[in-house]
Amino acid sequence: LPAAVVRSVMKTLDRLQWRVTKKAEDAQRRELGLPRATSPAPRRITASGALEIQAYEQLCFPGLADEWKEWERQRPFVGTLTMELMTDADEQVASWIAAGTPPICFGFGSTAVKSPTDTVAMISAACAQLGERALICSGWSDFSDVTHPDHVNVVGPVNYATVFPSCRAVVHHSGAGTTAAGLRAGVPTLSLWSTGDQRIWATQVKRLKVGTARPFTATNRDTLIEDLRLILSPEYVARAREIATQMTKPAESIAKTADLLETFALQRRSA
């Protein structure tokens, strides 16, 4: 699409999202002693000359850093930010993984599936056909009452930073953070996207040749088997390991971000 059209669409989306969040934002600004906002946050950020930290990997969007060269100080790339927080399920998951062959991890994050029962049945059947184990991380969907066979383990939130590297592959909704965790883990990815922003990251997974992607609504038992066979092939496994070596380390991303924020704050204070 022409750049002018893209900008117009994004401005419209920003305003629509602002209408959804405006009430909460106004309340927060009152608590901080700030006046009510009169425009969407992206417009205010740009107009004020604020620091626009790019918290994702440059390799996902080659050429963008060069395109933004004149704004390099305002739009620095730091890599993906993650807190790598431990969860209550981590110990049990680690024990289950160690008790058998490395599983395929399925995570849906903020995407709520319409039928948890059908989804678990589809995953169970596909993995049984391939002779694989499945670790299903429920995210915002409730899988608590769904029965499943022995080769499947259903859990709540887990620490992707420790779980993903222990798996054969990861299958997820293609959220920005989950995609980055998969790339850092060095295992192949199957992106089953649902929304426009998820499709952006799914496209990068395919472009980097670390996996494949399709809409979640177009996924069934047969397509899942086909896609898993593809990403478990040696070339995708090798490529995923290669890309992992090019990712920023979590500690480096956090340190760089903190330094940038401190420097920017000091500059604004002394201006």
Regions found by a protein language model. Name each.
Residues 1-103, 109-132, 146, 259:
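Nucleotide-sugar-dependent glycosyltransferase catalytic domains
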Residues 131, 138-160:
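Nucleotide-activated donor-binding/catalytic signature segment of Leloir-type glycosyltransferases, i.e.
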Residues 64-65, 142-145, 197-202:
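Short, glycine/polar-rich helix-capping loops at beta-to-alpha or helix-loop-helix junctions
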Residues 50, 75, 151-153, 211:
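Short, conserved active-site loop motifs that form the nucleotide-linked donor/cofactor pocket
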Residues 155-203:
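A donor-sugar binding/catalytic signature common to diverse glycosyltransferases
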